[in-house]
Each structure stands twice: as structure tokens, then as C-alpha cells.
Amino acid sequence: MRKSNVILVALGFSVSSAVMAQQQRLPSDVYEVYVADKERIEREYKADKERCNSLDGNAEDICEAEAKGREEVAKAELEDKYRPSRESRYEVRMARAKADYRVAKERCDDLSGNVKDVCLEEAKAAQAAAIADAKKED
């Protein structure tokens, strides 16, 4: 009797593992759209980066931070679109918070002295608030 129970349990695990593995994969047509969307995001990032190269100084840094932020948020949104979950929604919110902070920090670089320090503190506070909001949602 024990041997048959062990066999049934092992069979149950293998079937549930196969079902879970099947759920993790995207159908081929959906996967092709996913890959195309991912490639589009990468092309847009490269084009944005090329536009940034025409700028100088901190304007270029701000432009690059904005481009990188758009790319990271778009990739996180893509993952959430094709594999929706609490974790993927959290990753979208975190990507937005990080992107906003990166841009705000670059904008503060144009300033100097106490004004720059205040700007950086405000950027950090905004990021902390965005992260806290991301953690409490869902």
C-alpha cells in the first residue's frame, strides 16, 4: 500500500510540474509579438540615444536619463502585459520611480550650492515616496 501511495504522489508531482511548465511558456504567436515589442523598445532607445548625442553637457545627460528611463519602464510594462502578476506590476512602479529619480538627479546637476543640495534631497524624497507607494499597492 505504501509503495502505491509513493507512486501516486510522484505521479501527482510530475503532472503538476508539467502543467506549471506549460503555463510559464507563451504560445508561439504571442511570443513572436512579445519579441517584436521588445525589439521595438530597443530600437526606440537607440534612436533616443542618438538624438541625445546631438546635445552637449548636462542636457545630454538629462536626455540620456530620460531615454534610459523610458526604455526600462517600457520593458517592465511589456513584461507585465505578457506575464501579469503582482510582482510585474510592482516592477513597473519601481522602474518608474527609478527613472524619475535618475532624471531629477540629472536636472539637479545644473544647479549649484545649497539649491543643488535641496534639489537632490527633494529628488530622494520623491523617490522614497514612490518606492513606498509601489510597495503598498496591490
Where are these regions (language model features)?
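Bacterial N-terminal signal peptides
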Residues: L8-S16
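Mitochondrial intermembrane space
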Residues: A18-D138
